[in-house]
Amino acid sequence: YSDIPLNGNITTNKQKELIHGYKACVSYIDSQVGKLLSKLEELGLSENTIIVLWGDHGWHLGDHGLWIKHTNFEQAVNSPMIIYSPDHGLENNKSNSPVELLDIYPTLCDLAGIDTPSEVQGKSISQVMVDPTHKVRQAALAQYTRMSGGKRVMGYSLRDEKYRYTKWIQMDYKSGERYGNTIACELYDYEIDPYEKIN
C-alpha cells in the first residue's frame, strides 16, 4: 500500500484493493478466533473462560471520501466488540445499546464475580448480554481532533440509539485549554440518514 497518494483521489482499482485487503483481514481474524475457540474446547476450558474481542475503532472504506480510521463519524467511532461468557447471555445476541470501551473492565469484573473498584468510570454491560434491549447508559461519548483553518479543533461526539451530535471547539487538545468558540456542530438522525449525509 505504499502507492497511496497523500492527497487527491484514489483510483477505482486501488479502492477495490483496499476493500479486498480489509475484508481479508476480517476473514483472517475470524479464522484465528475460530482456532482459539477450538483450542479452548479441546483443552476443556471453554466453559470456564470469558472471551472479549474488541477493536479500538472502526474504519472508513471510502465513505465520506475517507480511507482512514480517525474521525467522529459512525464508521470510525463504532468499534467492533464481542463478549462471550459461558454463564451469561444467549449466543449471537446483538444490541444497539450505547456502550463505551471503558465499560469492558467493569463488565469483566461483573462476569468474574469480583467487585469493581469504586474509582472505575465504566458500567457493566453484563445485563445487555442477557437482554439486548437493556440500557446501561443513554449515550456514548467519543472525541477526536482535526485541523480547521490552520488550528486544531476538538470534536466531542455524543451518540444515542437514534442520533449523533458532534460539537467542534477550538482548543489545545493536549492541555485541554479552550482558545476559541464552537466552530461547527453536526447532527445526524440514523433512522432517516444512516450514512450521515444530512446535517
Task: Show which residues each predicted segment covers.
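Active-site-proximal cap/lid insertion segments
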Residues: 1-98, 111-119, 174-185, 196
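C-terminal cap/loop subdomain of S1 sulfatases and analogous C-terminal strand-loop tails that border
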Residues: 57-63, 89, 102-105, 110-190, ...
